[in-house]
Amino acid sequence: MSRLAALLAAGLLGACTIAPQPLAPVPVGTDRFRHADAPGAPAPSLAGWPASFGDAPLVALVDAALAGNFDIRAAAARVDQAQALLGVREAALSPTVGVDPSFNRSRVSGTVDNALPKRLMHNWSVPFNASYEVDLWGRLRGDAEIGRQNVLQADADRAAVRLRVATEVASDYLTLHFVEEDLATLARAIELRRTALDVIAARVRAGAASDLDALRAAADLDTARADLADSRRLRENLVDALAVLTGVSPTSFTVAPTAAAIRVPAVPPGLPSVLLAQRPDVYAAARRVDAASLETGVARTAWLPTLTLTAQGGFASRDLGSFLERNSSLWGLGASVAETLFDGGKRDAAVAAATAGTALADANYRATALGALREVQDALNDIAAQNERIVRYDSAARSTEAAARLSLSRYAHGYVSYLEVIDADRDALNAQRQLIHSRQALAIATVDLVRALGGGWTPPSVAPQNVAQRDDRL
């Protein structure tokens, strides 16, 4: 009983409200990212980021995915569901009113002595009833607030899905663009090697070259053709992936990347301390912590009594003609207090479970926040590395191409064997393809950075009941 009294006093002194515990800040260490061009500068708005690549088909594909992707539709349905459940929780704060009209017609036996003046009787009754639970300890308001946090979490989860889908579309499309470049490079190499094979065959027939040179040239041509087949397979797989992302069957989907060069934008990352407010997944994790903290507060109110007010009223009469007369009216008022005296430890277990749930949500929140910081830093690391690779492979591509031309000229004059030509040609092709792959990796790393920075998302400024009407266009 002393424990119950203490809980009652705590509930009264706490102004009868339940609020989530404030989140402790996540330590970010040094408030700057490595490889950031302007470490102290704020990150620019990323709204409309797909257009920054300067490719209209990319923007159109992202818009199509945001409109047709089924993962996004499922996430939107979860928001609608959370809003509906919020309505259920908020309804508990209002009184319930009901009506139970009835009509009975009965006949009394004529062979049994009774004092009733009539053997055939009618009973008309229309009683109304109302009940209202007084939210003394904030349990119902706390439960409604849990529903609001769930709506905000579902809305942030939807934004995270939209961002994931948009960036996956961008990554696959950009990869497809560079695969097309790779295919063009391989096609040129195959044409050159086919021509070289014809020249060598003529030299063999003239006795100026050996069969070994012809065999090496044929093997080199077949290797390039095998690489071409593999790149074509990759192109088809990317088109299929884009089809599914846009909500279309792969059997009826086509896409043709523009032939123009992709413009890879520079994306300043801003400050680590600001990043956590820009990520929808971090925001959703924080709302899960708030909801779990509220669950703990609501669970503790189970130790406190509940007060319910009831009221009845209406009319009842044997004759329909006198049904609405004053003497036919009836009413009643009441109040009840309920308190559980023994439940075998159920309430203690519920509080312990809710407390553990709060600790779990808090740990997940911190892991999500640290993961967000890592994703930004990893993307910056990739961008720095790919920029360096592009410089090196660009120089290597020019050098190896010149070496390949020189080697072919030397072979034509009989100064070197065809093995040297093959090696030089292979080096030139590898350098060209590595340059393409590095440019592709730079574009993908930039998309990864956009995703890691939240893609221009901002926390909702509207009520939870209206989050479905938010404009989340990228």
Residue ranges and their predicted role:
Residues 17-169, 306-311, 344-351, 358:
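Short flexible linkers and secondary-structure junctions
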Residues 2-67, 124, 148, 232-277, ...:
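Terminal intrinsically disordered/low-complexity segments used for targeting and assembly
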Residues 204-208, 411-415, 452, 456:
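A short glycine-centered flexible hinge/capping loop motif at secondary-structure junctions
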Residues 140, 156-271, 382, 406, ...:
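Periplasmic alpha-helical coiled-coil/stalk elements that build and connect Gram-negative outer-membrane
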Residues 118-122, 327-329, 430:
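Short sequence motifs at beta-strands and strand-loop junctions characteristic
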Residues 73-74, 90-91, 134-162, 212, ...:
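Sec/SRP-type N-terminal targeting helices
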Residues 122-130, 172, 271, 331-335:
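Hydrophobic, lipid-facing positions within transmembrane beta-strands of outer-membrane proteins
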